[in-house]
Amino acid sequence: MTDKELQENWNELLNIYKGILFNNCDFYNGINDKLTYDFACLQYAILKEKYKLKDIAKQGSELEKAIRLLSFFAPQITHKGDFQNNIGCNAIALLDYCLDKPEKGINCLNKSKILQECCLALGIYARRIWLMPYSPFDTENHVVIEIYDFSLKKWVMLDMTSNGYFVNADGVPLSVLEIRHNLAINITCEFIKTASTHEKFFINMQMERLYYKQYFAKNLFYFYVEAHNEFGNNNKRYCFIPKNFDLEKNIKQKSLSNIDIPPIGDISILLNTPE
């Protein structure tokens, strides 16, 4: 496939995925609960000291600090989609395993955990979000984080895998729900990379932006979010699904057991200011 054909293919897929989102804008009214965030984990002191997080993040807003962490760590971690999750899912164990070790890659699930815990260690509200596709035959998904910025008074999505985030027409960084909304109604939603160069797979930055735009559009149909955000894994999650979407049927088609079906949360949970 030529670069032009690839570009046309990604544009076509983008339009298909945006159409799916357009026809599924309204979310199910589920449990109205609050997510919690733990800033007191003893391991955060170790993480801050070992990796000099304050020196990396410097001063500024929560978003400015988080972007500096993203920009520092993302290029030093190799991506490995088929990583077996055989390392403890916490930033200390993961960074020890993969940082600046090209032969030891990890997946988005674990990359996002690193950035989340580095943010939490600096007192920044941060949570992982699983981005899930519409098709029950698509077993690939993505995991990112959101941080809360008090100057912007909003949540912002950051992605360790792509080393970037999305902005609207005014250049305002967007949350996961805002990215979904903008794609669904076909208004400006542009990918911004913190690095100035594109990955070798892409011929230029424009192609890289297009790829991630269609990739996110594919995976923004429904979401999982951890109920408690802390050091290490938390097994309790909420799911946020569009109306008329049969989550149980979808999961069964993917050959996952019923135990994997979390409670349905109200979408307002993702909009709330953290406390």
Q: Model regions: which residues?
A:
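Alpha-helical and coiled-coil interaction segments, frequently adjacent to or embedded
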Residues: 176-275
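RecA-like P-loop NTPase motor core of helicase/translocase proteins
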Residues: 3-6
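Hydrophobic/aromatic-rich core segments of domains that either
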Residues: 113-186
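Mid-length scaffold segments of soluble, non-membrane domains
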Residues: 103, 107-110, 121
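Short, contiguous, pocket-lining structural segments
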Residues: 61, 107-111, 137
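Generic helix-packing signal
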Residues: 70-73, 112, 116
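Secondary-structure boundary elements
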Residues: 8-106
